[in-house]
Amino acid sequence: VFAYAPHYEKLEANAEKIGFVPCKDLKGLTAKADTLVMACKPYQIEGVLSEIKEELKGKALISIAAGWNYDKYEEYLDKSTRFQFIMPNTPAMVGEGVLLFEEKNSLLPEEREEIKKLFEALGIVIELPVHLMGIGGALTGCGPAFVDLIIEALGDAGVKYGVPRKQAYEMVSQMIIGSAKLQLETGEHPGVLKDNVCLSLIHISEPTRP
């Protein structure tokens, strides 16, 4: 695995920790690889593509940058460059992410299967048509921020009543993990699961009633 970043010293330090080969030159990196992952900020993509467009000919490009889907890349890439847009989320950092694969792509079938296997190590892979990638990204990409807000708020409530902060966050985070796993494994409607809690703990039913 080869990697390039503008700040070589930082890249080199990370290479020792993670185990990849750092490259000082973007074009040199592109020449060495058959499949490349575009992981820079969206505003940087146009500049990167202008530098390596020729080197990308005949290669596969995977992009995880929000806002740049297949149709947008098609405007900049040579027709021989194969492409796939993937939208990950932050829980992928711990192997529990949601990886949204845009159905529209130009990868070879065997390439796409290899890429899916690679990203499955980071979480669950879900394929979506082009018109659903926006809302899908909002749900899975922005959703973690709302969950973090809940963790913070419930944790603060625990702290207010004497629970140590670290323990409060641990309790709330595990509760969310367990609740999510219960829904995934049972397939029950979230409303049914909510009612089950309210029936067993009747004193919380009023605040959760619409």
Regions found by a protein language model. Give the residues of each.
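NAD(P)-binding Rossmann-fold cofactor-contacting core
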Residues: 1-14
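Rossmann-like NAD(P)(H) cofactor-binding subdomain of soluble oxidoreductases
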Residues: 8, 18, 26-101, 105
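Mobile late-domain/C-terminal helix-loop "cap" segments
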Residues: 183-194, 198-200
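Internal alpha-helical scaffold of NAD(P)-dependent oxidoreductase catalytic cores
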Residues: 72-82, 98-136, 146-185
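Conserved small/polar residues in nucleotide/adenosyl-binding loops
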Residues: 202-210
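Short pre-catalytic strand/loop immediately N-terminal to key active-site residues, enriched for Gly-Thr
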Residues: 83, 133-138, 190-195
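Aromatic/hydrophobic pocket-lining residues that form π-stacking "cages" and hydrophobic walls in ligand
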Residues: 11, 154, 204
